[in-house]
Every structure is written in C-alpha cells, then in structure tokens.
C-alpha cells in the first residue's frame, strides 16, 4: 500500500503529457496560411496539400548526394554519348521548322537548345516521376536548405493555381526540377514561355513551349547568337600558368602558342576568350567565350557547361563540325 501511495503521488505531481502534433502537418498548416496570404486559392491548396506526407525516398536521395566529383572525361563519356548524339541529330532535323522559328525569335542557335534538352531530360524521355509539390514540401521541412525549398514550393503552388499543369502531372526530379527542361519553379516563373499561345506554359508536354523556354532562359541571361561557347585547345610546353582564367583576344592567345586541339591555328575572328583549366579535368584546357558564362548561369558546373558545348558541336553535320570563324 505504501508503494502504491508513493506511485500515485508521483503520477499526480508529474505534468500532464500531451502528444505533439505531427511536425510535418504543422508545417503544412503554416505553409497554407502563407500561401493564402500570397493570393493562392484555398481550393487549390486543399486539393494539393490534403493528405500530403513526407517522401522518405527524397530525403534519402538528398542525404546521399555524392561528395566526390566525377572527372571530366568520365562525365563527358556519360553526357555526350554516341546514343545521345545520334538521337539529338535525328530530333534536331525532325523539329527543324519549329526550332528555326524559336531560334529566330530568341536569338539562340537550335543546336544549343537541343543540347540542353538532351542533357536535362534525355530529350523529354526522362523528366522524373516525383511529385514536385511533395518533393519540395519534404525538402522545405527536412533539409538544410529549408528557406530555399520553401520559396520554390510556394512558386510551385502559384503555378498550379494559375492552371498551367494539373497537380497529378506536375512531375520532376527528386529535388523539384520540372519538365523537359528541368526548371525549378522559380526559373519556370521567370523564364517559361507559352509559345503556342494556348494560355499555359507547358514545359512537360508541349514541345514549342519547351524549346522557347530554354531559348528564353539563355537569351535573358546574355546569350550571344553570333558566338559559340568555346573549344578545347592545346598549350605549348612550359606555358605560363598565370594566364589561366585570363581573358584576351584570340590573336593574343595565338601569339602565346595556344592552338586548336588538332594543332591548327585559332580562328582569326576579333573576339576575346578566357582560358580555363577546370579541376578534375585531367589537365585539359579550354578557350571559352561569353556564352560559356551564360551556360554557367544555367548550371554552375564547368563539367556541365563543357558537356553542353561539346554536345551542341556534335549535333552539327560533320562537314561543318569545326567553325572556322568562331
């Protein structure tokens, strides 16, 4: 009896314990309030957020991102494969009328549009099958970049509220990149184009919108239609490493002994180029033009930018693979 009395006394003295609400549900409630304050309709939010749960696969992929960077040669072998080149050439010819129209409208060469299309989604064949809203909500709640993913999530909700895509078809990568050009919602909001003028900026299923959105992105951040991206070059023995990342006229690089990869002289065009020797590039060197920096604005990876430029070059007919004036 004494033991029972002591136990009862302890229980009475202990503060009442209330089971905490699911933290993710609380996050969604706060998100809903913020979205309504931004003008998103409650009916849209109810249809998208009701019953939403964390996607554990997204968190696993987020935590499993590789720390070691792939070397350039391996990266190019994967990104600029024979299969990708062959299919890209076929699709470039197949969509030539539309691509020429888009290229003329935005001032971006067709081959670069197709190269980005091929690299981002394998020409629309691999857009990802993750629910963009669920992925972004998971990352906005459980990643180290909560503010970034919350912003992207809110923009995604605006896109749905505007009727550009049905929620069930708003699919993308585990990180929230969407459609055939793999735009994050923020980029979609600013760069996506309704080229066929049907009232929707459809980067998932409308080819005209996909091509125009890619071209518009490049044009908006400074693409120069009269230039290419750059080229791989050879350096003379005992080349001064202090020239790395320097920008000079092509003629000056020629004077310092820099040559095309096949050993021939550089183009005679009056244009400046920067010498880069990226890390993990197996000692390879490149002279790059302003458009290379534009590609870095799409994806801040030297490997990526070089791969896009290389693929764009390979998409040309072999007879004009090497431009003499660029």
Residue ranges and their predicted role:
Residues 13-15:
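N-terminal signal peptide c-region/cleavage motif recognized by signal peptidases
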Residues 21-103:
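An acidic, Gly/Ser/Thr/Pro-rich helix-cap/linker signature
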Residues 35, 46-54, 107-124, 156-159, ...:
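Short, functionally critical alpha-helical segments immediately adjacent to catalytic or ligand/cofactor-binding
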Residues 54-61, 121-130, 142-146, 162-168, ...:
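Secretory-pathway/luminal and periplasmic proteins that interact with or process carbohydrate-rich
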Residues 194-203:
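Acidic, glycine-anchored loop motifs typical of Ca2+
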Residues 6-8, 18:
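Cleavable N-terminal signal peptides
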Residues 233-326:
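C-terminal soluble interaction/assembly domains
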Residues 131-140, 153, 178-193, 214:
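Substrate-binding/active-site groove segments that recognize
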């Amino acid at each position: 009896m004494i033991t029972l009395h002591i136990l009862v006394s302890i229980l009475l003295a202990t503060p009442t314990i209330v089971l905490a609400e699911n933290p993710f549900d609380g996050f969604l409630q706060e998100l809903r309030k913020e979205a309504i304050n931004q003008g998103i309709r409650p009916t849209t939010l109810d249809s998208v957020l009701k019953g939403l749960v964390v996607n554990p696969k997204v968190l696993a992929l987020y935590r499993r991102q590789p720390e070691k960077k792939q070397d350039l040669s391996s990266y190019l072998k994967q990104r600029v494969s024979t299969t990708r080149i062959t299919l890209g050439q076929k699709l470039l010819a197949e969509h030539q009328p539309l691509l020429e129209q888009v290229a003329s409208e935005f001032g971006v060469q067709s081959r670069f549009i197709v190269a980005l299309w091929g690299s981002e989604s394998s020409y629309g064949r691999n857009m990802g099958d993750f629910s963009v809203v669920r992925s972004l909500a998971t990352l906005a709640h459980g990643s180290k970049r909560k503010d970034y993913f919350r912003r992207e999530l809110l923009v995604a909700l605006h896109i749905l509220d505007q009727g550009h895509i049905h929620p069930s078809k708003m699919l993308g990568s585990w990180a929230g990149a969407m459609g055939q050009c793999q735009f994050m919602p923020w980029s979609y909001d600013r760069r996506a184009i309704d080229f066929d003028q049907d009232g929707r900026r459809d980067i998932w299923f409308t080819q005209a919108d996909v091509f125009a959105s890619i071209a518009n992105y490049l044009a908006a951040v400074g693409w120069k239609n009269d230039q290419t991206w750059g080229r791989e070059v050879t350096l003379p023995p005992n080349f001064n490493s202090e020239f790395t990342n320097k920008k000079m006229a092509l003629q000056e690089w020629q004077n310092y002994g820099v040559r095309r990869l096949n050993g021939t002289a550089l183009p005679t065009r009056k244009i400046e180029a920067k010498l880069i020797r990226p890390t993990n590039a197996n000692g390879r060197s490149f002279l790059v033009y302003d458009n290379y920096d534009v590609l870095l604005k799409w994806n801040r990876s030297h490997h990526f930018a070089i791969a896009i430029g290389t693929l764009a070059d390979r998409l040309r007919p072999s007879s004009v693979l090497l431009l003499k004036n660029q």
